[in-house]
Amino acid sequence: KVAANRADRESSEGVVLAKVNSDNTSGIIISLNCETDFVAKNDDYVQLAQRLSDHALGFTDKKSFLDSDFEGMKVSEKLLEQTGIIGEKIEIGSFEHISASFVGSYIHAGNKIASIVGFSENFDNAGDVGKDLSMQIAAMNPVAIDENGVSQEIIAKEIEIAKDQLRQEGKPEEMLDNIAK
């Protein structure tokens, strides 16, 4: 009954976890969402998120994960059970999977931000590079992987910002377009 009463509530708090399998070739990021920061910081809730993320490593999509058996019931049923116990809507928000020759990850303190990267080849210091690159992604929040993923609107806005900076530096107006691009 509690779960039914909470179904329409917004679950915008929670934890985000990244996990990589033992041979570093597959990884997941999942978010376990709840309604309040108070619940998100609760040890039992964080431990549930850890167990769910460990279990999630065996799946490549959210639907099969939610339909899978977990601690004697389906994951989706476990979330409803926890909603009834905790008294807040509990749900899986994001579920992302990656497979690659090498996968690295980073989880920022507090379990609010995580990132995961995959390399097409494994190399000697891939572990360090994977962690460092994942950390930079988490810190910088990039809009795309490369220039092809950036919308024309964002490109135009950034060009205008660069042109304004160049004007302030006293660059000639007729050169601004070429310099900014």
Name each model-derived stretch:
Residues K1-K181:
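N-terminal assembly/interaction segments in proteins that build large macromolecular machines
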